[in-house]
Curated annotation (Swiss-Prot):
Transmembrane helix listed as a keyword: yes
Broad class of where this protein is predominantly found: mitochondrion
Keyword line: Electron transport, Heme, Iron, Membrane, Metal-binding, Mitochondrion, Mitochondrion inner membrane, Respiratory chain, Transmembrane, Transmembrane helix, Transport, Ubiquinone
Similarity comment text for this entry: Belongs to the cytochrome b family.
Gene field: MT-CYB
Functional note: Component of the ubiquinol-cytochrome c reductase complex (complex III or cytochrome b-c1 complex) that is part of the mitochondrial respiratory chain. The b-c1 complex mediates electron transfer from ubiquinol to cytochrome c. Contributes to the generation of a proton gradient across the mitochondrial membrane that is then used for ATP synthesis.
Annotated protein name in UniProt: Cytochrome b
GO biological process, one term: mitochondrial electron transport, ubiquinol to cytochrome c
């Protein structure tokens, strides 16, 4: 008799995705981040649900409700810090996952890659709106500065900003709608992640060598379920260590001050995972130009498949492109550092140089190095 695991309509879907899924036998730990991102999403939804039970999305009580969660709710401090630091872990996994996709040529699976880019944008939007909810100084001013960027859109800009605000400034209406969207978006992300997985399983995973793995596949379970548990252990160890020992390591001290529209903080900056994009935004003196550069810093991922000039899928055997890739990683770290610095000399010049390098490497230097490598292969 055939196992119900293979015949039951619901069990069959799970079985084909996580148990009997044919998986390349040589994929490394870099392929672990998909399951880690799924874990992060589950952690975020669970902790977020418990936080929403005690949080009040009102300008008069939001800040004190977060203080109440931290002080009075049983393990409220832990739920809150798991949620806040869980977001950091989520973005670390996201960046590593995207980096793996770039390095090993996973962007050639167009549908999977484009859904992944949409997932990244949706996650960034969710994190931004979540940062506004505690209603501290950085919450308020971050929301004001970032939403105000839309006023750079010609003709409809200022109307659009007021429509998003629900008034003439960031206020009660803004906080309420941000809470609404912050609550609903993770479920949309979960749905998009399912579609992401669906498209991935149409083609199957790539592998480090970049050549077809059709002749050599193994079932996902027990091989990769066991392997993924190791990565999961490290993720949970890092998250719990951060939460229990240094919960405020990645947060801004300004956010422990109640939002005050009459007092601007000296340095308005977002959470660390947005600093690279924020640095690109600030490096352009023109407002509209900055907004376009900010959007392109993420949307450029969608044009990467079109700039793929190499005869090989993976970068594993392409030393010139590898140099370009690691230069891009160093450039992103530089941008992250610059995003947290004040707008003054020499940070302005470093930020502008790093921003130019970011787009130059992705759009020009990586395709160029691929063409050189193609030429060298003929020799």
């Amino acid at each position: 008799m055939t196992s119900p695991r293979k015949t039951h309509p619901l069990a069959k879907i799970i079985n084909e995705s996580f148990v009997d899924l044919p998986t390349p036998s040589n994929i490394s730990s870099w392929w672990n981040f998909g399951s880690l991102l799924g874990t992060c999403l589950i952690i975020q939804i669970t902790t977020g649900l418990f936080l929403a039970m005690h949080y009040t999305p009102d300008t008069a009580t939001a800040f004190s409700s977060v203080a109440h969660i931290t002080r009075d709710v049983n393990y409220g401090w832990m739920i809150r810090y798991l949620h806040a630091n869980g977001a950091s872990m989520f973005f670390i996994c996201l960046f590593l996952h995207v980096g793996r996709g770039l390095y090993y040529g996973s962007f050639l699976f167009l549908k999977t890659w484009n859904i992944g880019t949409i997932l990244l944008l949706a996650t960034m939007a969710t994190a931004f709106m979540g940062y506004v909810l505690p209603w501290g100084q950085m919450s308020f001013w971050g929301a004001t500065v970032i939403t105000n960027l839309l006023s750079a859109i010609p003709y409809i800009g200022s109307d659009l900003v007021q429509w998003i605000w629900g008034g003439f400034s960031v206020d009660k209406a803004t906080l309420t709608r941000f809470f609404t969207f912050h609550f609903i978006l993770p479920f949309i992300i979960a749905a998009l992640a399912t579609i992401h997985l669906l498209f991935l399983h149409e083609t199957g995973s790539s592998n480090p060598s970049g050549i077809t793995s059709e002749p050599d596949k193994v079932p996902f379970h027990p091989y990769y379920t066991t392997k993924d548990i190791l990565g999961l252990t490290f993720l949970l160890l890092a998250l719990t260590s951060l939460t229990l020992f240094t919960p405020d390591l990645l947060t801004d001290p300004d956010n422990y001050t109640l939002a005050n529209p009459l007092n601007t903080p000296p340095h308005i900056k977002p959470e660390w995972y947005f600093l690279f994009a924020y640095a690109i935004l600030r490096s352009i003196p023109n407002k509209l130009g900055g907004v376009l550069a900010l959007a392109m810093s993420i949307l450029v991922l969608m044009i990467i498949p079109m700039t793929h000039m190499s005869k090989q899928q993976s970068m594993a055997f392409r030393p010139i492109t590898q140099i370009m890739f690691w230069t891009l990683v160093a450039d992103l770290l530089t941008l992250t550092w610059i995003g947290g610095q004040p707008v003054e000399h020499p940070f302005i010049a470093i930020g502008q140089t790093a921003s130019i390098m970011y787009f130059l490497i992705i759009i020009t230097l990586i395709p160029l190095s691929a063409l050189i490598e193609n030429k060298l292969l003929k020799w």
